[in-house]
Amino acid sequence: MSLNFLPGRPNATPQTACQATWQNHTIFAYCSGNNLIILTNKFTRLQTIYTQSDCTAVDINSQNGFIALSFHNRVLIYKPIHQIMQNPKWTQCCQLFHDDTPVNCLRWSSDNELAIGSDFLSFWKIKDNFGVYQPILQWNQKQPKPVYNVIISQDSQLIVSIGKYDCNAKLWKRVSIVGEQAIFNLTMLPHPKPITAMRWKKEPDQVSKNNTASHALYTLCEDKVLRIWSCFEMEKNHTVQIWGEVPLSPTQKFCVIIDNWIIRQTLSVKDSEIFDISDSDIVILGSMTGEMEVLALNNLSQDPPKPMTKKTISHKKVKKATMLNDTRYLYLPEIQPYDNVKGKLSFLVHDLQGVIRHLLIDILQLINNKTEDLSAALEHKFTGHNKSVQKLVRSSDGEALLTTSRFSENGVWYPQKLNHGVSLRLQNTIQTESPIKFAVVHELGKQVICLLENGALQAWECPTNRKEDSEQKQSYLRVETRLKEEKKIHPIVMLNTPEPKHSHERHFTALIFSDGSIKAFEVSLTRGIFEVKSDSLDIDGDDIYKISIIDPVHQTFVSNRPLISLITKKGLTRTYKAIVNYNDRHVQWIKACEINTGIMNCTCIRGSSTGKLCIVNSTGKVMSLWDLNRGVLEYEETFHNPIEDIDWTSTEYGQSIVSIGFTGYALLYTQLRYDYTNNTPSYLPIEKIDITAHTAHNIGDSVWMKNGTFVVASGNQFYIKDKSLDLTDPFTYQSIGSRKILSNDILHLSSVLNGPLPVYHPQFLIQAIYANKLQLVKELLLRLFLALRKLDFESQDVSNLDSNLGMDPLKYFIAKDRDYPVESFPDPYPCFNKTVSLALTEQLTKTTLPYLTRHQQITLITVIEAVDEVTKNENIVDYNGVRFLLGVKLFLSHKNIQKSILMRDVSWALHSDNKEILLSSIDRHITSWNRAREYRIAYWIKEQDLVKKFEDIAKYEFSKDDKRDPSRCAIFYLALKKKQILLSLWKMAIGHPEQQKMVRFISNDFTVPRWRTAALKNAFVLLSKHRYMDAAVFFLLTDSLKDCVNVLCKQVHDMDLAIGVCRVYEGDNGPVLGELLTAQMLPETIKENDRWKASFIYWKLRKQEVAIKALLTAPIDLENNSSIVDKEVCVNRSFLVEDPALLYLYNHLRNRNLKYFIGSLNVEAKIECTLILRVTDILCRMGCNYLAVSLVKNWKFIERNSIPVQKLLKSPTKDRAYSAIGAMASEPISTARMRPSLFDKFGSPSASDIESPNPKLPNSLLDDFLQPPPNSTSSNSLAQSSSSAPRSILDEFVSPSYSQHKENLTPKAPNDSVGETDNSENRKDKLSKDILDDLSSQKPQKPKKSAITKNLLDDFV
């Protein structure tokens, strides 16, 4: 990270800036308003010291690092806290006061003595009394006019002072010291013109103490002659005389002197001898056009003195951009060596008009006459506001920035590239008659529209066609209008309302008032400001609690986007767009989005044009990030400090970055890929911008500009961070982790943390398995193994691993596993098998793959093991079973952070045709109820299996830990209605404190009212004692299942046990289970917006048509659920609500049976299409772009108005098919491999074909609905049809007698085998057609290899 400062506008006094060298480090200090700015460590370390009023002069003692600072009539002395420069900091040690006149100048000598100029010239010594510093006045003298400038020699023997416009310099010679008093003699040094500058020739501190016989004084006056005076002792007489002159040419405007000690320190001895300047001082005479003359002066340090000689060393030319060409005055602080950088000089230029520039000069280039060009690189630029910045307003494109203050000081700034990072350049100043309240910046900063505190609406022109360093920075007020003062309402936000096509001549601006009303204006610099018609915000009677402008973060101009976001007191959030109709002079406001966040009394809200929103809760310490496009919460975090500011930006790919501002620092967060498998957060802090080490002032405002530049305003200072990263930042280090990034910047890192995944990434493989692409995953794992093996053999770095593994992209788009082309690889690894699995796992334990963290690589090994296990069971487990086994494997590898398998995994098992096999694969792990709860067996295993597992668990719970406690297994035996076994166990529980009481009590008959009442009383007593499980047992003892499951659900908080007890006690689909699901589980599901759980609930309630709809629809929008839960309570607290796997299960179920299919017809095509696009966006956010393309390419939309569908819906036989589905246990669950798809039955292309079925083709599902009445149908024709056709899926839906009749007529094939089944399936695949082929709006054609496949959504989007 490169953090540059604009510490504040320097004050316009000659001694406002000072540069010195202390302990071989360059220190720079200057005055800005009432602040002292100190920069150290190569100008990277900043300290800001605040004073009572504006500062006038500052000087640094190069001997001990003390800093003297004057303001008004006082001088403050600051000492360094540490004597080492790693973390330099200064603190006040004493204060000086002489008289009431303002202090104009001050200078240190080496012996901690100080000369101060006001109306008096005074001389002070700062005495150290064991760490307590005491200022002692040693001499003072009233001056005829205020002292304008004063300098003191290093040995404190000579002081020179002048007044403003003086032609005579006063030289004060120290002649004696009596006690703590000093005596000075005066010598006048006449000049022909007013003196403009003067300085003493300096030596290193250790030399100056030993050699005090001779001093050289430089003076410059308006006659443009540099005079060198020599002050020396001769025969005990003090002598001062002119020792030489250096005239300046008419074009030369300034003079810079480099003392010989600086040359010796920065140049090697060899270079000094080569250029013959080892004993010379250098004088640089420069013009405002960048032309420089470099001279060497000799014999200035000789004792006894010799006549001065001078020679021209070189002539140089520097770029005008680094100098000033329009200023009248220049102040050049002393040149110093640049820290320990050999051959570099630190050169400062103060223009006395608000800017100090820091340049680096190569001294070898300066004295070398072989080249004319001199590179003077602009390292830093020190400017800013004079008073505190109130607000930062950026242009919509991020190219310009407006800063406002509490006064009339406002400025337009542009980013400026420096050698080390980015700074800001002041382009224009705007002086308004009243402080700016709101503003909008247009045309790359060339136009500013602002509303002032006094109600004036103004448009300013800010010219930019000037020279870069021009001091003509004023702006021009072009048009103005006054708003009528409203007493009841007031403007709360001002914004730009873009037209569909951008116009440079006019702009539309809107003012939103506190009641939601809006005033819109057309603003033209040439024609004026005109009010146009505007709608009010549709806020439905709600108050606007908080409102903010949405940050425009797109890389290009976008007009059709939300412009404002607002939130009510109860947390209802809305965003609005504006549509500008220029012809009608009308601005229309449309609600773009509305979500209920549930965050009441929020303190801050800020949105992004990419559809993100950040909200801070009422405490100011909880930040939540929302996706407005999907209406879900993506991230939430709680901080220790209150949040003050929020700002958004994005990469060119639309990946969001948000800054969360606090009082002294800002945290930068980037979005991450969605991870639905590991439940990792979707945002990550990647950098911390901390200014507390540089200033004690709080952050006032912050804003993002283009190209990842982040600007912070604090007081009158700016802190500018470019896009580069600080690799020592712990947040940055953690976010990069073990990844290798190509570019060290925040935008690139955000793209790496998002973007497409390599195809060997575990998340990609997991989502591919969910998308029914098991064969693709196997090939990818085999290719990964072969690629790593090849890299190992060829001794190549693993970073050369192809992220796509050389896979043909078309293979990702194959819809069904059975259509996947089998590719044979060379021996000894022709396909993925156990050998490959073990070898690949071993490789991954030794090799770190690119773009994968350690945790992700562990997950990849888990996926490999799961695929290996699935491969063994592939022929006996259907695909939902495969998905379930993968979920179990992932759960086992994440048990430390995951309590149980997910409801997604439960749904896979629930809709699998092989529940017994799935149970057997995990049965050995399920011993206790805790283990059973981990696998959520109460939700999905069959009733008879659950009864058996309850018996096993009851036995284990009784005997575990060798305590033989019947109370632990009581709930299970009573659910099994085996009270006698429980009684026997109590009789065996010798030593249990409650044995005798329980044996006597349980022995009673609880069908008798007396004992039933006694048991109920005991249950309530146990509830009052918080013995909830025992209370549930006593409720169940009295046959009060409802009270029992209520206790288990509400007090024990074990929904799994409640469901299990219901299913075992009253059988599947009993009334108590139905009430439990609807009264207890459903309301929470609606609040959590859990679609997996909602689908399960409706499946258990025998509402398949609603269960399939629940996969795509929010639970509150199903049936009459809006009356169960208030919509305001429903908050999408997680981005996981729209799992892409929901869509995969939906597609599977609508192919499963008729009731699911008819239920899917209730989902509108528009909703289905929208959901497809949203899931596609989610998959891309997950990094699974190939799978997103495959989903869009292969999805089939049902044409709801097609003839087959309409006749199906109108058929009376449909209702009989509905009624034939009884309890859930009787749901048709024959394996998909053995049963043709439901959609195979809709293969007739026309109505005539439907009414006249071809007897040679298999019997169609619709034949049973569309045939003539039963009395006109002969049994012979039925037998003939049945004998040649495969068994219809409707046999399981129609009446039992009809099914039995068909079974009798259909010949049975002897000795069925798996191989024959597979052959039968292959034959059926050739004949059968998917129902979606006929119900979709267009039949998809098999893509040719050379042609581009048409996207199915072309007809819908």
Curated annotation (Swiss-Prot):
The question of whether Repeat is a record keyword is answered with yes
One biological-process term from Gene Ontology?
Answer: vacuolar acidification
Domain of life, source organism: Eukaryota
Residue ranges of the WD repeats are 98-134, 142-182, 190-239, 384-423, 431-470, 595-636, 638-679, 898-939
Disulfide-bonded cysteine pairs: these are: none
Q: Where are the Phosphoserine modifications?
A: 1244, 1248
Q: Where in the cell is it found?
A: Endomembrane system
Pfam families the UniProt entry points to: Rav1p_C
Q: Positions of the region Disordered?
A: 1243-1357
Naming one, the record's GO cellular component terms include:
membrane
Q: Which Gene3D superfamilies match?
A: YVTN repeat-like/Quinoprotein amine dehydrogenase
- Asked whether the keyword Phosphoprotein is assigned, the reply is yes
Compositional bias (Low complexity) = 1272-1288
**Quaternary arrangement and interactors, per the entry?**
Component of the RAVE complex composed of RAV1, RAV2 and CBF3D/SKP1. Within the complex, it interacts directly with RAV2 and CBF3D. Interacts with the V-ATPase V1 subunits VMA1, VMA2 and VMA8.
Functional description taken from the UniProt entry:
Component of the RAVE complex, which is required for stable assembly of the vacuolar ATPase complex V-ATPase under many conditions. Required for transport between the early endosome and the late endosome/prevacuolar compartment (PVC), suggesting that assembly of vacuolar ATPase at the early endosome is required for transport from the early endosome to the PVC.
In the UniProt entry for this protein, what further remark is given in the free-text comments?
Answer: Present with 149 molecules/cell in log phase SD medium.
Name assigned to this protein: Regulator of V-ATPase in vacuolar membrane protein 1
Organism whose genome encodes this protein: Saccharomyces cerevisiae (strain ATCC 204508 / S288c) (Baker's yeast)
Gene that specifies this protein: RAV1
